[in-house]
C-alpha cells in the first residue's frame, strides 16, 4: 500500500515536471515568435518609411567686373554677400544646395571678369553663407588662371566647407572617390563634366588633362556614372555643354544626356549656354528621371544693356533655381 502511494507521488511529481518543461518550452517558443514578429514589424515599418531630400541647384555664378566693383569696400576688401540677399532664404530651405562657379580663384593672378575669370578668395565666404554645399568646377573657364588656378579654386572652396567637383589634384581622377553626400539618410552622388576649356588645355599634357580634369569622355563618364549607381541611391550629373545663348538644346546634348540616364543618372542639371533651356522627364525602369538642359545664369553681369548683338540677350537675365 505504501509502495503504491509512493509510486503515485512519484508519478505526480514526474507529471508536474513534464508539464513544467512543456510550459517552459511553449513559453520560449511563444517568446521567440514574438521576437521574430517584432523584428518583422520593425523591418516592415522601416521599409514603409519614405525618406525625402530637397535638392536645389542653379545656373552659373559668373563674376564679371561689374560684380567686383559693386562688392568693393572702402578698405579695399570685397564683400559679395549682397549678391544672395533675396535668394538666401530659398537656398536655406534645401537639404543640399548645388552651384556652378564659372571662374577661378587664384591669388597669384589679378582680378578678371572677362574673357578670363579670376575672383578674390572672399567670394567663397559669401557663397558658403548663402547655403551652398557643393560647387561644380567642370567648365570651360576652370583653366583661366592655369592648372594651378584650378587647384587653388578647389582649395578655396574646401577651406569654407564647400565640396568642389570636376577638379582632381590628389588623388587623381581615376583614383579619387566619388563625391557622395548623405542627405537625410539618402546617399546622393554628384558628378560634373565639361565639354572643353577654351583651348587652354593645349598648355597641359594629355596626362595632366586625364588626371586632373573632368571632360566629356564617354567611356570614363559611363564608368563613373555606373559606379555611382552602385554606390549611391541618387545620382546627379552637372554637365557643361551646348551653344551659348541658344534657347533649345542641341541634338548632341539631347543624345548625350539621354545616354547618361541610360547609364544610371537620375537628375541632370545642365549648364553653359547662359540661358534657360527646356526640361524633360524621362521614364526608365518605371521611374521618372529629370533633365534640365540648361539652368541659365544665376549671378552675372550679362543683361540686355551689356549683350549687344545677341538676340536672346534678355534671357541671360533669367535662371533656374
For each predicted feature, which ranges?
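Acidic, metal/ion-coordinating pockets
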Residues: 2-321
Amino acid at each position: 500500500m505504501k509502495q503504491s502511494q509512493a509510486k503515485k507521488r512519484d508519478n505526480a511529481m514526474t507529471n508536474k515536471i513534464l508539464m513544467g518543461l512543456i510550459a517552459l518550452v511553449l513559453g520560449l517558443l511563444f517568446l521567440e515568435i514574438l521576437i521574430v514578429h517584432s523584428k518583422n514589424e520593425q523591418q516592415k515599418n522601416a521599409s514603409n518609411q519614405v525618406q525625402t531630400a530637397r535638392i536645389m541647384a542653379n545656373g552659373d555664378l559668373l563674376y564679371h567686373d561689374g560684380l567686383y566693383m559693386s562688392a568693393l569696400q572702402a578698405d579695399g576688401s570685397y564683400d559679395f554677400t549682397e549678391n544672395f540677399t533675396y535668394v538666401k532664404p530659398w537656398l536655406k530651405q534645401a537639404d543640399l544646395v548645388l552651384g556652378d562657379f564659372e571662374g577661378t580663384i587664384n591669388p597669384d593672378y589679378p582680378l578678371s571678369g572677362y574673357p578670363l575669370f579670376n575672383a578674390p578668395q572672399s567670394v567663397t565666404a559669401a557663397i558658403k553663407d548663402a547655403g551652398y554645399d557643393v560647387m561644380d568646377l567642370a567648365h570651360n573657364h576652370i583653366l583661366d588662371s592655369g592648372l594651378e588656378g584650378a587647384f587653388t579654386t578647389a582649395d578655396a572652396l574646401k577651406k569654407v566647407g564647400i565640396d568642389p567637383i570636376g577638379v582632381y589634384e590628389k588623388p587623381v581622377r581615376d583614383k579619387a572617390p566619388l563625391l557622395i553626400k548623405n542627405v537625410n539618410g539618402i546617399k546622393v552622388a554628384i558628378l560634373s563634366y565639361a565639354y572643353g576649356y577654351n583651348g587652354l588645355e593645349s598648355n597641359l599634357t594629355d596626362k595632366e588633362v586625364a588626371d586632373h580634369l573632368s571632360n566629356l569622355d564617354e567611356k570614363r563618364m559611363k564608368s563613373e556614372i555606373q559606379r555611382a549607381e552602385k554606390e549611391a541611391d541618387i545620382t546627379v550629373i552637372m554637365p557643361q555643354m551646348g551653344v551659348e545663348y541658344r534657347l533649345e538644346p542641341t541634338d548632341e546634348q539631347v543624345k548625350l544626356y539621354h545616354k547618361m540616364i541610360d547609364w544610371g543618372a537620375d537628375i541632370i542639371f545642365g549648364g553653359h549656354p547662359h540661358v534657360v533651356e527646356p526640361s524633360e522627364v524621362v521614364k526608365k525602369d518605371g521611374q521618372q528621371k529629370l533633365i534640365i538642359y540648361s539652368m541659365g545664369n544665376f549671378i552675372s553681369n550679362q543683361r540686355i544693356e551689356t549683350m549687344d548683338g545677341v538676340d536672346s540677350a534678355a534671357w541671360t537675365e533669367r535662371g533656374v533655381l
